[in-house]
Amino acid sequence: MAGNSIGQLFKVSTFGESHGVALGGVVDGTPAGLEITEADLQIDLDRRKPGQSRYTTQRREDDQIKILSGVFEGKTTGTSIGLLIENTDQRSKDYGKIKDVFRPGHGDYTYWHKYGLRDYRGGGRSSARETAIRVAAGSIAKKYLKQFHGIEIKACLSQLGPIKADVFDWNEVENNLFFFPDVSKLEALDEYMRGLKKQGDSVGAKVKVVASNVPVGLGEPVFDRLDAELAHSLMSINAVKGVEIGDGFDVIEQKGSEHRDELTPNGFTSNHAGGVLAGISTGQDIIASIALKPTSSITIPGNSINTENEAVEMITKGRHDPCVGIRAVPIAEAMMAITLMDHLLRQRGQNPHVHHEHGPIPGSV
């Protein structure tokens, strides 16, 4: 099965299914000498893991990471880093009745037609459970980027259903179970989600991810432009149906005089482009947003077909997230980190000699 790896010089490959024995991955390209422990990776995994609130799936997985290789005496060796997370709370019996039925809005129908068979237990390979290894790999990239280059990556839930953040207080993001930056909306979020659970329905969300202190020059025009690669990596996250860089689709209503990010000796005057021009980082904050669809795993009856092309009524059972966007926050950070790490190594490999007398201007005035 192709499509299990991302990156060139910093390459992440994953394997495993939702109800399989374990999830695993291999991370290639990490420079030697980075101090890393399982506890370092566990921090982000704990932010992502299921069962932490009544608004995420109640599947209980500890997501305990094991480093199998590539680390010796607490430091990376420069060789492949092997990662493993055992699955401990599978309830495959929840899915026995749908082994011949296609859940609408899921990959059951497409996987079956592509491969001639499918793992119906929790979605198999198409389950968002696969992203646990991405988060672990992203933690390696995040630590390297911050320690050696001062690059910091953060994300938040900026919208859940109709409720939007009007204030972005990043200090509050880790203080609530929604990863929401506007504390004035927390009560409304709680009330909305309680109503949603009573209805047996789900809702979509928007996640914002920001990378700060990114150097000028990352990105490989024309097909590996940094924004194109970010869109690729973020779009690969389960349930993502849209990616915006900078102002995104708001640029439709902007005029050129408004949108252009003017330059001064003291820095850029704005950042409508989201930190990328012509596919190359500008040194400003890189800003991206992703739109996640509402999960189709809901208890409201719906229409579908089975493998015999017969009409059936579908009611999804099992343990599911009423809003997948909540746990997507650390996943978005991980994919941003993996992409920036790869392009940082690529720039260092191709253009280490490029230096300008005056250096880059600040990211903002």
From Swiss-Prot:
<keyword id="KW-0456">Lyase</keyword>
<feature type="binding site">
    <location>
        <position position="54"/>
    </location>
    <ligand>
        <name>NADP(+)</name>
    </ligand>
</feature>
<comment type="similarity">
    <text>Belongs to the chorismate synthase family.</text>
</comment>
<keyword id="KW-0288">FMN</keyword>
<dbReference type="InterPro" id="IPR020541">
    <property type="entry name" value="Chorismate_synthase_CS"/>
</dbReference>
<dbReference type="GO" id="GO:0008652">
    <property type="term" value="P:amino acid biosynthetic process"/>
</dbReference>
<comment type="subunit">
    <text>Homotetramer.</text>
</comment>
<feature type="binding site">
    <location>
        <begin position="293"/>
        <end position="297"/>
    </location>
    <ligand>
        <name>FMN</name>
    </ligand>
</feature>
<feature type="binding site">
    <location>
        <position position="278"/>
    </location>
    <ligand>
        <name>FMN</name>
    </ligand>
</feature>
<dbReference type="InterPro" id="IPR035904">
    <property type="entry name" value="Chorismate_synth_AroC_sf"/>
</dbReference>
<protein>
    <recommendedName>
        <fullName>Chorismate synthase</fullName>
        <ecNumber>4.2.3.5</ecNumber>
    </recommendedName>
</protein>
<feature type="binding site">
    <location>
        <position position="48"/>
    </location>
    <ligand>
        <name>NADP(+)</name>
    </ligand>
</feature>
<dbReference type="InterPro" id="IPR000453">
    <property type="entry name" value="Chorismate_synth"/>
</dbReference>
<keyword id="KW-0521">NADP</keyword>
<comment type="pathway">
    <text>Metabolic intermediate biosynthesis; chorismate biosynthesis; chorismate from D-erythrose 4-phosphate and phosphoenolpyruvate: step 7/7.</text>
</comment>
<feature type="binding site">
    <location>
        <position position="319"/>
    </location>
    <ligand>
        <name>FMN</name>
    </ligand>
</feature>
<keyword id="KW-0057">Aromatic amino acid biosynthesis</keyword>
<dbReference type="GO" id="GO:0005829">
    <property type="term" value="C:cytosol"/>
</dbReference>
<keyword id="KW-0274">FAD</keyword>
<dbReference type="Pfam" id="PF01264">
    <property type="entry name" value="Chorismate_synt"/>
</dbReference>
<comment type="function">
    <text>This reaction introduces a second double bond into the aromatic ring system.</text>
</comment>
<feature type="binding site">
    <location>
        <begin position="238"/>
        <end position="239"/>
    </location>
    <ligand>
        <name>FMN</name>
    </ligand>
</feature>
<dbReference type="GO" id="GO:0009423">
    <property type="term" value="P:chorismate biosynthetic process"/>
</dbReference>
<keyword id="KW-0285">Flavoprotein</keyword>
<dbReference type="GO" id="GO:0010181">
    <property type="term" value="F:FMN binding"/>
</dbReference>
<dbReference type="GO" id="GO:0004107">
    <property type="term" value="F:chorismate synthase activity"/>
</dbReference>
<dbReference type="GO" id="GO:0009073">
    <property type="term" value="P:aromatic amino acid family biosynthetic process"/>
</dbReference>
<feature type="binding site">
    <location>
        <begin position="125"/>
        <end position="127"/>
    </location>
    <ligand>
        <name>FMN</name>
    </ligand>
</feature>
<keyword id="KW-0028">Amino-acid biosynthesis</keyword>
